[in-house]
Amino acid sequence: MARYRCCRSQSQSRCRRRRRRRCRRRRRRCVRRRRVCCRRYTVLRCRRRR
């Protein structure tokens, strides 16, 4: 839960945009675990940007 904190903070808007883009690009993996995939990539992107 702590890992997803970044997306729930003020970076949520940025995360949401990246999350949709990333998910659509990796559609094959996202289709099955759409939420997990999106959330995982979102967290990674957010953490690296910070």
Swiss-Prot record:
**Tissue specificity annotation:** Testis.
Task: Tell me the compartments it is located in.
Answer: Nucleus; Chromosome
Q: Name one GO cellular component term.
A: nucleosome
- This protein's source sits in the domain of life called Eukaryota
> GO biological process: any one?
chromosome condensation
Molecular function per GO: DNA binding
Its subunit composition reads:
Cross-linked by interchain disulfide bonds around the DNA-helix.
Which cysteines are disulphide-bonded? 7-15, 38-46
Q: What is this protein called?
A: Sperm protamine P1
Q: State the InterPro entries in the record.
A: Protamine_P1 (IPR000221)
Biological role stated in the UniProt entry: Protamines substitute for histones in the chromatin of sperm during the haploid phase of spermatogenesis. They compact sperm DNA into a highly condensed, stable and inactive complex.
Q: Among its keywords, does the record have Kinase? A: no
Matches recorded under PROSITE patterns = PROTAMINE_P1
Alphabetized UniProt keyword annotations:
Chromosome, Developmental protein, Differentiation, Disulfide bond, DNA condensation, DNA-binding, Nucleosome core, Nucleus, Spermatogenesis
- Family per UniProt? Belongs to the protamine P1 family.
Q: Say if the entry is tagged with keyword DNA-binding.
A: yes
